[in-house]
Design a protein with these regions (language model features):
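A detector for short, charged/polar N-terminal pre-domain segments
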Residues: 1-11
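A basic, amphipathic helix-loop patch mediating RNA/tRNA/ribosome contacts
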Residues: 11-54
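C-terminal structural segments of small proteins and small subunits
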Residues: 47-74
Length: 74
């Protein structure tokens, strides 16, 4: 599981995935959400701008396998 450090209390889901290098742009998150390939704390997420807090775990189901990111405070 890759840890993504943030220096604020929250981060939006699309921003986190951009920061992690999982997507090239925030807009690239939309089709992944529509296909229910993004889970937040084990639950399928539909909101691109979902606010994440330290401790949240984001799972991204890609063709090459699953990637997991944990939000941690910097």
């Amino acid at each position: 599981m890759e840890k993504i450090e943030i220096s604020t209390e929250t981060i939006q889901l699309d921003q986190l995935l951009k920061l992690a290098g999982a997507v090239p742009t925030g807009g690239a998150v939309k089709p992944l959400l529509e296909e229910k390939r993004i889970l937040v704390n084990g639950v399928p997420e539909t909101a691109r701008r979902k606010k994440l807090v330290p401790g949240d775990v984001v799972s991204l189901q890609m063709e090459e396998g699953e990637k997991h990111y944990k939000v941690v405070l910097y």
